[in-house]
Amino acid sequence: MTDLPDSTRWRLWIVAFGFFMQSLDTTIVNTALPSMAQSLGESPLHMHMVIVSYVLTVAVMLPASGWLADKVGVRNIFFTAIVLFTLGSLFCALSGTLNELLLARALQGVGGAMMVPVGRLTVMKIVPREQYMAAMTFVTLPGQVGPLLGPALGGLLVEYASWHWIFLINIPVGIIGAIATLMLMPNYTMQTRRFDLSGFLLLAVGMAVLTLALDGSKGTGLSPLAIAGLVAVGVVALVLYLLHAQNNNRALFSLKLFRTRTFSLGLAGSFAGRIGSGMLPFMTPVFLQIGLGFSPFHAGLMMIPMVLGSMGMKRIVVQVVNRFGYRRVLVATTLGLSLVTLLFMTTALLGWYYVLPFVLFLQGMVNSTRFSSMNTLTLKDLPDNLASSGNSLLSMIMQLSMSIGVTIAGLLLGLFGSQHVSVDSGTTQTVFMYTWLSMASIIALPAFIFARVPNDTHQNVAISRRKRSAQ
């Protein structure tokens, strides 16, 4: 990358900052949830919606981001994404009620949904093909640092300032990024086909109302009749999309994708698997603070080993899959993650706090192996003409399943606990114990899906991918 022009390197820095902002925000909020609840006068059991509102908005908006970038231009959309994300951060900091905070987080989600995919598209357009991998490695590195810094930084700001600062720190970075985008980023456009607005709206309605219905009366206060109505609307919307996409070459996501067995199994496993995994980043800091009495900063520091384990495992995951095959790796890591979740709960409740960093490091390793294996399994056998559509659908499913996972975790806390749990409550640890046991069971369920993956122990993943790209 050293032979790239200075202007191109500056543009890559802009994209990298966007990746950093988006990835930092996915983890920095988790540590602050108990403090937010106290400040806003809410039960900690309701605060999962702060995460859900952001992640669900990202899932809904992702399918439109690439088309908008091609139609309006990458500079215009990337600038808009940064501005919306920054404004959302400002409104989050100014929020005085939970509902105001949820609306502001949704605005952040609109910006976050466009920032990363449009950033990837920008790199593709400004960097020669032979240097694309090196450029993507450069711009995604800050995105890996964000989750590492997020929990500890969030805890530090909450403990020594206030939760508002986890959003306020985005504002100067966002302003600099927006100005730099206007000054340095070229506005590439491409000829686009007509956007599938009908399909987009049907999917958006289906995902949003079903997630809202899942939150149930505990979180939303809706009556059983209203929840049943939401479920009916969501199911009808998704069925209508399936009918709409049948034999429709302009559909948002072609149903031809599901003719590839590994894609179908991988997508189903990714959806179910990330529901379980999505609970962990939300539940762990909440449990450490409310269940065990850790300070926000201490709870944030405890999350760092999990991120380090995840980053370290990425270097050898291809060799692991090549040696043992997708089916064995995915079944083993799914059951292993369930056992590690139980181990974390047991060591924490026994008071063996010195063991927790090692358990969380192991959790990060297992989770990272499973994530990487699920992603490559889902996409590896798709024909070239469906690869882009399949990748977009996988990205949307990843965000949707994470929002559902956090929603279920909040629902479990509400089912087992009272409306107001606290460190002083004698029943609090019992509430968390039942919640962790339920989570471990949910995490183990996708093993039944992965057991149906063809036995490909001797299929070399790296060679297979090189052959596909060469064709």
From Swiss-Prot:
Pfam families noted in UniProt: MFS_1
Parts of the chain on the Periplasmic side: 1-11, 70-76, 125-137, 186-196, 246-262, 307-341, 417-430
Membrane topology, as annotated: Multi-pass membrane protein
Keywords: Cell inner membrane, Cell membrane, Membrane, Transmembrane, Transmembrane helix, Transport
Database matches in CDD domains: MFS_LmrB_MDR_like
Compartments where located: Cell inner membrane
Disulfide cysteine pairs (residue numbers): none
Entry keyword Membrane: yes
Superkingdom: Bacteria
Topology feature Cytoplasmic, residues: 33-48, 98-101, 159-164, 218-224, 284-285, 363-395, 452-471
PROSITE patterns membership: MFS
A GO term for molecular function: transmembrane transporter activity
Coiled coil: none
Ranges annotated as spanning the membrane: 12-32, 49-69, 77-97, 102-124, 138-158, 165-185, 197-217, 225-245, 263-283, 286-306, 342-362, 396-416, 431-451
Protein name: Putative multidrug resistance protein MdtD
Source species of the chain: Escherichia coli O6:K15:H31 (strain 536 / UPEC)
